[in-house]
Amino acid sequence: MRRSVLRLIILCLGVLLALGAVGLARLAESPCSPLSRTPCVRVLFLGNSYTYVNDLPAVFRDLARAGGQNVETGMVANGGETLAQHAASSDSLGAIRGSSWQFVVLQEQSEIPALASAWRSQMFPAAEALVGSIRAVNATPILLETWAHRDGLPGDGLDYAAMQVAVDDSYEGLGQDLGVMVVPAGQAWAAVLRVDPAITLWQDDGSHPSLAGTYLAACVLYARLFHASPVGISDTGGLSSALARTLQTVAGQL
């Protein structure tokens, strides 16, 4: 009996770990309040673990609601998923077409924007296809510029600063070519580190965001999407008030 229970526990843990590794597909969670006088803003996120770790859509939603916005979010994100994979995914394309999203946030795999050959051959054509699909349903595409790895890409001769410049250039160039808004989360990370290098924005792997990193990305998206500073919003995303205020301030100044 005990062995059977133990096997069941191990099986359940395995399933949970597998789900965490694969990622998430979640649509229309916590719908807009029908009682709110503020128009509903519906935002779909297409990304990978940079999006689903710490649940960026939920952090953004809570921040926006605390700022007086009536927001609903959805997400399709799998570990390591690229924009090219999203562009060929029935789940991603179905999510774009299946609900009345007003905005769709696109987040590319972290290394591709830093490598010129990968940017030209993979990121640009995939983003172009996705932007076309998004605009076909009268939604607005948004590019979420990511942050460099803490140690850059040593194998490609890029330290943190050089990788961030390359990522910035790729997203900004893509935004200009396709006429798409860019949310400069990566530039915000660099700005925060200039203000206080002791703030921990990465997890221990030096790649994925800490809770502070996710909150910062949410603040930058809030500032760009609503054309308003997040400074003073009461929702701190589980951070200290002082740290949240610092991140809000940097996001509001970009």
Annotate the PLM regions.
Residues E29-R42:
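N-terminal low-complexity, Pro/Thr/Ser-rich intrinsically disordered segments
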Residues V41-L44, Y50-A129:
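Conserved SGNH/GDSL esterase-like catalytic core that processes O-acyl groups on lipids
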